[in-house]
Amino acid sequence: MCLTYYHPHWTGLTAYAKRLAEGLARRGHQVTVVTSWFDRSLPREQMYNGVRIVRVPAPIRLSRGQVQPTLGAVVRRLVREHDVVQVHTPMLETWLVGALAHRAGRKMLMTHHGDLVMPSGWWDQFVQRTVGYLLDRAAACADVISIHSQDYADHSDYLRPHLDKVVAIYPPVEIPRPDRDAVVAWREELGLNGAKLVGFAGRFVEEKGFDYLMKAIPLVLERMPGCKFAYAGDPNVVYERFFQQCMDLFEPCRGHVTMLGLIRDQQKLANFYAMCDVFCVPSRTDCFPSVQIEALLCGTPLVTADIPGARQVVKATGMGLLVAPRDERALADGLVQVLSDRAAYVKPYEEIRATFNPDASVEAYERLLQSMAS
């Protein structure tokens, strides 16, 4: 399994890969993860939860990616020890890994986590075109491409030429059940008792559309003056200073937004979701934000932009409301609607878990990988 970042780096993509790798290892398979040595305090090689992790030096960072000059040599050595290769994209060297796998007589599964969509600046657009070209080559040499939903694949310019290779498998999402006593205490500690609370989470980057939420907040407050908002995530993203660009929108809302920072502890994250009355996903583009499933499993309905991929969770469960994308008024209307009649949108935990079952996802990948290895 190859990907740019792996544990302890934490994004939806790395969480997905970690759950899948460890799930396959628990089923008795030998799993090796090849990833960048992005943090030199980590060991170059280690076993973690049954998974062998091999980290490759990455002396150059290219926007969100890591350039790994010796990756080819590492993959060439390891590929013959394994029956099939999986690559999680976006990853600059996917095409190289695919070529080396084929040279060794192995097949490559490319797991696509979303088209690369960068801000409009010349450098970001250069990166998008460069990486896009490399990913086009990768898709062409992939034997199978897995994606989180067929909806996203059908609307992806990048995947459309390769739909005959695409298999849709829901991501393996896991999160503890919320601690209700801790939720009540945390609300009180933050001074949020009695307030309607809207949660949002993730990297504060342009594609997440948080600027539309900032524009929607005053519109919500006109109709629900006591409403509060809570953000779980890192606003200061190294490769994209979008939060700083949004300060004119954020400053008027500052008194209504509680900044919680990046929450790494999974129990605390579950408590965050449960603390919120509604969870908001205002993305411009998003393949399949796993935060949506986490929120639903913690009993919190969604208000989500009606875009390919992201809308699949609401469509599959009915636990939330879809609103027009890139439209702060539609977003505000949706938030007020769900906050005003929250119980109408809440579904039983068992229904959500039956739809998004991590064991079923790992089993589906196991069957797919075994078919490719045979």
Model-derived segments and spans:
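Conserved acidic donor-binding segment of nucleotide-sugar-dependent glycosyltransferases
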Residues: A316-T317, L321-E328, V336-R342
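A short, active-site helix/loop in glycosyltransferases that binds the activated sugar's phosphate group
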Residues: G132, D136-R177
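Nucleotide-sugar donor phosphate/pyrophosphate-binding loop at the beta->alpha transition
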Residues: T70, K107, V117-R137, D154, ...
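Nucleotide-activated donor-binding/catalytic signature segment of Leloir-type glycosyltransferases, i.e.
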Residues: F243-I263
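Short alpha-helical donor nucleotide-sugar binding micro-motif in glycosyltransferases
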Residues: V79, A270-C276
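Aromatic "clamp/platform" in nucleotide-sugar-dependent glycosyltransferases that forms part
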Residues: P90, R284
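Conserved donor-binding/catalytic core segment of Leloir-type glycosyltransferases
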Residues: L192-K208, M214-I217, A230
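Short hydrophobic beta-strand element within catalytic cores of glycosyltransferases
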Residues: P301-T304
